[in-house]
Amino acid sequence: MPKSTVRPGAEIVGESAALKEVLEIAQIVARSNSPVLLRGESGTGKEFFAKLIHDSSSRHEKPFVKLNCAALSAGVLESELFGHEKGAFTGATSQKEGRFELAHGGTLLLDEIGEISAEFQAKLLRVLQEGELERVGGTRTLKVNVRLVCATNKDLETAVAAGEFRADLYYRINVVPITLPPLRQRDGDIPRLAQKFLQRFNRENGRSLSFAPATLDILSKCEFPGNIRELQNCTQRTATLARSDVIVPQDLACEQGRCYSPILKKAVAEQVGKGAIHGLARGETESMGQPCDVGVFAAETVMGQSGLIGRERLEQAMATAGWVQAKAARLLGRTPRQVGYSLRRHGIERKVF
């Protein structure tokens, strides 16, 4: 097979300082075989970063294998990751290699790692510690060599404290945490991404659509709580409904009140405040130009204890980071917003340091 000439990470679009910073970290991390934990909100591109780490590593010619662990029972996960022998259970009509075997020599991405059951956590930990496994229904021990990358949007520290996630597994997978920035923190990247998604739409549909400058200005003011995935959805829907080859503000789905289904709209409102429906920032307006009822920063009031970082741990991180919240967030594997929230809750001021 000819070697790919595509630059690693070419599918990651953006020029913002926040994006460049995590791209640099990912490139550095790729030089080792240490486990990586990709953290961040849903839709921030964790799978793309996992692939970037793989493609930039010495394992780039070996397989990159992924599995989304969400909603899979312990039995299904065991079969998917470790494989099974013929007749191991009802329906096992043939031998099957698991994802660990398929990824041997390469990289294994376990997405939604925070959703695996306590029952399976112990089995996964054993494989990670010993580098060997047995297929379900088998007796032969198989050696496996994979670079593990995990991804989650869950607060694993809270899960550990609540006894929902094993502390030993947490330390095993959280060797190098990388927190991906949400789209609202990536200054200037929304127009670039929207253009990319529109170009893709044009290729796939034989169209030649373009954005009016005013349309990109409106998109740039949106928070997009669903991040890149939501922006892609918005762009595709708007392009589909556009009245001409130039997409004007009136074509935007959010301008026509069609951004979310009623159920999703209610869920988003409960999570981030009514002012963030379709992500309009505080001080901006909704579709008819009326002031938003609640600013997006009301999200802090519903963060609750799940985002609170322990005082001693927070003070140590802030001291190490020289009071730079973004750096402290990377050290803690949290978001800068969670760091700021915890500083205020604990009443910590710079003079402490």
From Swiss-Prot:
Keyword Transcription in annotation: yes
Stretch forming the signal peptide: none
Sigma-54 factor interaction domain segment(s): 12-240
Alphabetical list of InterPro entries matching this protein: AAA+_ATPase, HTH_Fis, Nif-specific_regulatory_prot, P-loop_NTPase, Sigma_54_int, Sigma_54_int_dom_ATP-bd_1, Sigma_54_int_dom_ATP-bd_2, Sigma_54_int_dom_CS
GO BP annotation list: nitrogen fixation; phosphorelay signal transduction system
SMART domains in alphabetical order: AAA
Key words of the record: Activator, ATP-binding, DNA-binding, Nitrogen fixation, Nucleotide-binding, Plasmid, Transcription, Transcription regulation, Two-component regulatory system
DNA-binding region residue numbers: 325-344
Residues that, per the record, bind ATP: 40-47, 103-112
Origin superkingdom: Bacteria
PROSITE patterns with a match to the protein in the record: SIGMA54_INTERACT_1, SIGMA54_INTERACT_2, SIGMA54_INTERACT_3, SIGMA54_INTERACT_4
Pfam families hit by this protein: HTH_8 (PF02954), Sigma54_activat (PF00158)
Phosphoprotein among keywords: no
GO MF: ATP binding; ATP hydrolysis activity; DNA-binding transcription factor activity; sequence-specific DNA binding
Subunit composition and interactions: Interacts with sigma-54.
Function: Required for activation of most nif operons, which are directly involved in nitrogen fixation.
This protein's name: Nif-specific regulatory protein
Natural source organism: Rhizobium leguminosarum bv. trifolii
